[in-house]
Swiss-Prot record:
This is Small ribosomal subunit protein eS27. Signal peptide: none annotated. GO terms for cellular component: ribonucleoprotein complex; ribosome. A zinc finger (C4-type) spans 21-43. PROSITE patterns: RIBOSOMAL_S27E. It comes from Thermoplasma acidophilum (strain ATCC 25905 / DSM 1728 / JCM 9062 / NBRC 15155 / AMRC-C165). The keyword Ribonucleoprotein applies.
Amino acid sequence: MADVKFVKPKNINGHFVKIKCRDCGNVQVVFARPSSTVTCNICGATIAKPTGGILATSGEVVEVL
């Protein structure tokens, strides 16, 4: 299994973000400051994890809500 790089996106002022899974392309709404790991509803891959503040994501931020 390859290492997945998680990055903290910039300019997230909203409370929710739409994130696109890099494995299956599914787009789902995620809280911008999660307290637990977020997995994709379709393939089960980890798409976001908590960092003590803003989320760290392995997918693409599609939209800030």
